Amino acid sequence: MAQRIENIPFAKLINTRDLGGLPAEGGKVIRPQTFLRAASLYQLVPSDGEKLVRDYKVAYDIDLRIDKELSRQPDAPIPGVEYRHYQLREDVMENFERKRGETVGKMMTRMPTMAQLYLNMVSKENSLEALRNIFGLFMEDVVPGEKAALFHCSEGKDRTGIVAALIEDLVGVPRDLMLEDYMLSNDAFEKRNNWYYRGTRLIMNKEAADSFRDMYRANEYMLTDMLDYLEKTYGGTEGFFREALGFSASEVKAFKQKILQ
C-alpha cells in the first residue's frame, strides 16, 4: 500500500526519507527498507545510527559529495554500515571561486545555472561513472528488508534528489509524487532558506537574490528539465540506464523486480 511522503524524525539527521511505499508501475510499490535519502551524516549521533540499522536495515552509506566537502565534514561512522564514496559532481563547480574585488552579483552572472548542473550530472562522463558505480551496488548488493542503502550529499537535495528521481522514474512513480518527494527538502531547510534570502537581499538586487536562491532551494523545473532531457535523449530513464550507464535490459528488469512489491 502506498504511504505518505514525509521526513523521518531523528535527533540530528535531517531531510531523511524512506522511498518505500511510493506507488510504481503495475500497481506495485517500492519496497520499504531498501533506499533511504538524507542530508549529510556529519552530525549523526549514535542513537541515529542505531535507528537507521535497527528500523531501516541500512547496510550501506553512499556519500555523493566531493572530496573538499568530505574533508570539512566527514560522515560519522555507523557500526555495521559499509561506507562508499561516489563523487557525483560536474567538475565545473569544484574550483569555482569569487574573483578578487568581484561583487557577489557579478559572480552570479558567471556561474552555471542549477538546471545546467542537473543536466551535467546525467551527461558528463565523471558523473556517469559515479552513477554506474552507485546503481551497480544497488543492483548487486542491496537486499530489500535486509541490506538497505542510504545515499546522501550535503543537504539531500540536488545530488541526492537526482539519484532518488532516477530510481523513482525507472519504476514508474507518478511525476507529481516524484516532485513532492523532491520538494520536501525545502521543508527541512525552510528557516535557513528564509534567512539566506533576507541576507542576500541586503547585498544584491532582487533579480540576483532570486537567482542565488536556486542554489539553496529545490525547484521543480530543475528536476523536470532533467527528466525531460532523459526522455528526449534516451526515450526515458530506462533507456538512460541501458545506453548511458551500460546496464543490460535484463539487469534493469531484475533490478526493478527486486525493489518492487
Which ranges hold each PLM region?
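Cys-dependent protein tyrosine phosphatase-like superfamily
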Residues: 1-150, 163-261
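Ser/Thr-glycine-rich phosphate-binding loops at phosphate-binding pockets of nucleotides
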Residues: 155, 159-160
